[in-house]
Amino acid sequence: ALDGISSHTRSWLIQQNIIGVYCLKYNRALIGFLFIARHNHMPLSADQVSALCKIGFYATHALRNANLYMNAYRASITDDLTALYNRKHAFEIIDELCLSGTPCSLIMLDIDDFKLYNELYGSKEGDHLIQRCAKIILSALDADDMAFRFSADEFLILRHGSDVAASKAFTQSLVEVLTKGSMSDMVWEITITCGISVFPDISVDGRELIHNVEQAVYFGKLDGKGHLIVYRKGLENRSQNPDIRTAYERV
């Protein structure tokens, strides 16, 4: 029945030929509605009401199971501390995007000397730093961007499009906020080493895209930390020939 419903909602339901709403409840918690529509508006028979109650019962448990599955799935792809997507999901999403042939850019942010930060100020303060960084990263994302906590002190940002200049500008702006803006009340002035790699211009698949961005960060650390390195072919050769400058770009 439509008793207890506002006149506006009742009018809309009648226009849709809905003659009743069955509330789906589990352990007294409302989890959904079953709308009952009938074109001739004739009263339901006792058998029809009984059948609808059975449908409602099974629908309640089906919806409950679906919610449990979604909650479990969400937990399996989410980092507990930051609510960002986790490392496992990063590999899944990046592989999937590259397999589809969609051009993309991958940014890695690595907090310099995070282990020392934890040792000096304690794990609680370290967790607070990670949470603050995650919050700022989330606030900076565009609609199609995705952020992941890749390791204890590393974040990944996946962006659609392989425009290196745009990703550099985005990263520089984000790092400015992380190190000098909203993080100014932190006990330690942090620095962040960043890497950028792109698909398909440089990387051929998702695994190589991740490997290349890790290499960019690695060489950024070698350059003294706090740098932004764009991965170029031949970057690894710097370890044999430090004079090679065309293989990478230091910002």
Each language-model region and where it sits:
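Conserved long alpha-helical elements within nucleotide-processing catalytic cores of c-di-GMP signaling
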Residues: 86-105, 115-142, 148-152, 156-160, ...
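Short hydrophobic/glycine-rich mini-motifs in sensory/regulatory modules
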Residues: 24-34
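Amphipathic HAMP/coiled-coil signal-transducing linker helices
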Residues: 68-85, 93
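Cyclic nucleotide signaling catalytic output domains
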Residues: 147, 193-202, 208-223, 229-250
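Allosteric cytosolic regulatory segments
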Residues: 53-60
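Catalytic core regions of nucleotide second-messenger enzymes
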Residues: 149, 178-193, 221
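Signal-transducing coupling segments at domain and membrane junctions
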Residues: 1-18
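A short, aliphatic-rich beta-strand micro-motif
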Residues: 17-25
